[in-house]
Amino acid sequence: MAAKVYFSREITPEKVLELYKMAGKELTGNVAIKLHSGEEGNQNFLKPDFWKPVIDFVGGTVVECNTAYEGQRNTTEKHKALLTRHGWDAYFKVDLMDAEGPDMVLEIPKGKQIQKNYVGKHLADYDSMLVLSHFKGHPMGGYGGALKQLSIGVASSFGKAYIHGAGEPEKIWTADHDAFLESMADAASSVVEYFKGNVIYVNVMKNM
């Protein structure tokens, strides 16, 4: 059955909540809220107050994982400090899913490039997921949206390198580009399969 997709030219926190309700699907149990919490120095990410109405309504936990590259999000200590500077933990419960190991491994038996996806261990604590994406261009992924959130976003620090390297993490920045994109699709499919359809997606084109 084809998924229902709703569109709106009005981009406000209230409209996001309205569209979520229109989906007509209840996310049950412990809900993971996957979004991009913002790089250091980036002023265009969608701030906590923009997402607050829908997150408060759902009552979930904002989840992130550490990065595989240098910066302010590649260690748990630095990442938590940045989340605080950006105001996320002032509004919501926040969980760095790969703050402690070992990684959780999702099998991808029909994966084209990768057959395993290494994700944050705490993913096992959640029963459903709300994917809140700031849809925009991305220099490597082409687009930054729901697929990237489900793949790179849910992957652990090691898992990110594994996807970028198309199964060879040591080739994180040198793997064939098409193989990387296919690895993202493989990884995203494993997260969708894990939640058995208990996922809702909201994509917002704002601050492009």
Regions found by a protein language model. Name each.
Residues 2-53, 57, 61-208:
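Extended, low-polarity segments enriched in aliphatic/aromatic residues
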